[in-house]
């Protein structure tokens, strides 16, 4: 053990966690997010926390981190103890890493970002920078200087930076809430390896939430599965608790029925023809490629680009000519930071191209508009091109879940009764009917994602652009999402999706365009 490892290991001190018939109801909600939760986690244990979407996993993690708030923020039942004291009094004992790398990057420089938490603990300056050096070393970012810009980090590097910031506070409990949900495969590997180094060197107690669990099975020694509170009986509680082999071997069928992911479970196949393209190194501007795209346009193209360059401050891709077709799903893949989300926003007409244009089939062009989607008004896009944002909250415009889904149909001239009928059907498909009157912003992450998809599907666009449509989904809702996307495809729409989800690409038989950093 190095001096760095010995210092951190001797200082942190793993702590235990206990839940005693614990439950929490958010102040704005009628039902409890979770209820009747009982378990004891011993110091140094490594626990994978599972459950269906909406089972309260993130609420429990926030409770353990002491950030749920007081009585004015909600109602608590039972006890939740961290290190033997009420979790709300134990905030300095926990380190929490969330799923969004960008949301956790606070300051401009790597060193300052890691030091931020320590500064809030009022530690001496020398001690702070000592911890910063130690933590960056443990997560494998010690090669970066303290002055290195956080803007230049990839998604995986940002998550490792967030992990370093949590580790620098010397918590006895490390909480990871879907830390790889928004990462490419390389980023997933980086975070997995960094966490392995952390728990091997510091021996901290670990609780990790993740829907796709294969990444973590080699690091955990225990699995706890939360039940989803029933709308009538509000039972919830813990469905299963034991080693991975015990839980998945004895309770696999029960867990799958409840919506949890279970290793080895088959997924539905909704494939059509499968093709592979590559967007990078000028591949799509060759004469033969351009001729092929022109032939495709004359057949069934609904959206296409002409010599497109996209980006914000600088070009992320240039001279792109690509067509999207009726009844086809296209996956935009590639590592974090190459511009997949930026390209998606450009294709949806929401971000101005740096050069070139995005066009549609002639029959889709609104009256008195040119065939350049960025020049259209928002009302022109409705029913033609729909966008599901990476952050669901960015598209919510009403104060109730039901009204959110009804916005599209109402804006397209449907009566209120017709719009609500469409909304109710879509909420049922998305397992959101019990939240019809709830504020969209109070839903869980997975529920918000399903609502954002439902609101776009209700408008029945000819082109549907989706940014990470399956993040935060359990086994049941993931399969339902795949069925819905396949339905949209089979009804004649073109679907364009940014994704790192290889299972989704395979299930839909999607055409793949790899967005390459070679376009810079």
What are these regions (language model features)?
Residues 127-144, 417-435:
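Conserved ABC ATPase "signature" region
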């Amino acid at each position: 053990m190095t001096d760095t490892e010995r210092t951190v290991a001797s200082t942190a001190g793993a702590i235990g966690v206990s839940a005693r018939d614990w439950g929490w109801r958010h102040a704005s909600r009628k039902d409890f997010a979770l209820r009747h939760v009982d378990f004891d986690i011993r110091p140094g244990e490594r626990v994978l926390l599972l459950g269906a979407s909406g089972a309260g996993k993130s609420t429990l993690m926030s409770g353990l981190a002491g950030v749920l708030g007081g009585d004015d923020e909600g109602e608590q039942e039972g006890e939740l103890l961290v290190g033997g004291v009420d979790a709300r009094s134990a905030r300095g004992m926990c380190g929490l890493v969330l799923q969004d790398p960008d949301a956790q990057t606070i300051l401009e420089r790597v060193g300052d970002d890691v030091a931020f938490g320590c500064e809030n603990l009022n530690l001496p300056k020398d001690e702070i920078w000592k911890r910063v050096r130690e933590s960056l070393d443990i997560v494998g970012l010690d090669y970066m200087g303290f002055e290195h810009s956080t803007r230049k980090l990839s998604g995986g590097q940002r998550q490792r930076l967030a992990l370093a910031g949590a580790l620098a506070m010397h918590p006895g409990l490390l909480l990871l809430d879907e830390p790889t949900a928004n990462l490419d495969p390389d980023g997933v590997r980086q975070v997995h390896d960094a966490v392995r180094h952390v728990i091997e060197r510091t021996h901290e107690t670990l609780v990790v939430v993740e829907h796709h669990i294969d990444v973590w099975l080699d690091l955990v020694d225990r699995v706890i599965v939360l039940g989803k509170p029933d709308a009538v009986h509000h039972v919830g509680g813990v469905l299963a608790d034991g080693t991975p082999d015990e839980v998945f071997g004895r309770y696999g069928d029960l867990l799958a029925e409840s919506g949890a992911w279970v290793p080895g479970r088959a997924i539905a196949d909704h494939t059509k023809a499968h093709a592979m393209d590559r967007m990078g190194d000028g591949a799509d501007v060759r004469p033969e490629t351009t001729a092929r795209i022109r032939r495709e346009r004359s057949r069934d193209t609904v959206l296409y680009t002409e010599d497109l360059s996209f980006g914000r401050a600088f070009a992320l891709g240039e001279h792109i000519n690509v067509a999207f077709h009726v009844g086809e799903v296209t996956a935009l893949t590639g590592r974090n930071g190459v511009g997949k989300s930026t390209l998606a926003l450009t294709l949806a007409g929401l971000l101005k191209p740096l050069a070139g244009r995005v066009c549609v089939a002639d029959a889709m062009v609104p009256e008195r508009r040119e065939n350049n989607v960025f020049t259209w008004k928002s009302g022109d896009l409705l029913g033609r091109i729909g966008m599901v944002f990476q952050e669901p909250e960015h598209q919510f415009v009403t104060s109730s879940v039901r009204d959110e889904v009804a916005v599209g149909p109402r804006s397209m001239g449907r009566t209120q009764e017709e719009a609500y009928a469409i909304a109710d059907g879509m909420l049922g498909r998305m397992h959101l009917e019990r939240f019809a009157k709830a504020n969209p912003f109070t839903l869980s992450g997975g529920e918000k994602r399903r609502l954002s998809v439902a609101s776009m599907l209700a408008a029945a666009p000819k082109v549907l652009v989706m940014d990470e449509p399956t993040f935060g989904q359990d086994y049941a809702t993931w399969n339902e999402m795949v069925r819905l996307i396949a339905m949209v495809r089979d009804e004649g729409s073109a679907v364009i999706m940014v994704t790192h989800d290889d299972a989704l690409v395979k299930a839909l038989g999607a055409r793949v365009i790899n967005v390459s950093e070679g376009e810079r």
